[in-house]
């Protein structure tokens, strides 16, 4: 039985609590927040604490779902005794802090996971299988919603675009060149377009908008053999294959990814990893993601 705690009881923290109820062989022993949320302790039949040391002393694993600017502080506290730590994305936005986290993680052999949930999106996982023997020429991401009043301690690059940067790295590998532009309002980036040139020659284009009336999550992929159009919200995937026969018409097939809860799958994977030796290979990818986000910000603010 793994004793787990949740640090941060905002919207994302509560989402984690709801999903932890559906995972076997864990015990939710403590929830922590600076603001009193005792009603949540009663609802989830656990202990509420305003003392982070209580959390540290009693947990085998913890989930940090606090504002981004506090991630580093809570990681330092939790890493004193806890060996399994899950932190919502982005891990941090400061490169020096990221390097310090890597150093501590390696020295103390901490199992550290970062909440890039789209890797667990069933549509993305199905696309990954479809692309197994297919060379990608181009990736096109569009991610929009109306989060203008919700993004407070960062901007859309680290809040929204980082998801698609992660998927670009996941599907097509390292990036060698970045070109970006965007719209700023009151020193915050509200709209951004970025082109990433990968080392394997694939070109990724990402559009992110935090002030759009319509919520969109799409991924369009051009490969040597076909064109794939995916809706990450509805799980619909349309595959258009080139017809090399006598007929000029291309062949089109529509499929749907299974209806799975991405956050639940992500948390199950984290709990499973708590029982194994630390494997933090993905931290290198997340570090590259942070570097890319910083470069995109730099280019937009310099324009």
Say what each PLM segment does:
Residues 159-236, 264-278:
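Contiguous beta-strand/loop segments that form the cofactor/metal-binding neighborhood of enzyme cores
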Residues 69, 92-148:
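A contiguous active-site-proximal alpha/beta segment in oxidoreductase catalytic domains
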Residues 16, 44-104:
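Beta-loop-alpha module in the N-terminal Rossmann-like domain of NAD(P)-dependent dehydrogenases
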Residues 115-122, 147-176, 286:
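Mid-domain beta-loop-alpha active-site segment that forms a flexible
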Residues 1-43, 271:
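N-terminal Rossmann-like dinucleotide-binding module
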Residues 117, 223-284, 299:
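C-terminal glycine/acidic-rich active-site capping loop/insertion
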Residues 86-87, 112-114, 230:
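Hydrophobic residues in well-ordered beta-strands that form the structural core
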Residues 61-66, 110, 199, 269-303:
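C-terminal helix-rich "cap/oligomerization" subdomain common to oxidoreductases
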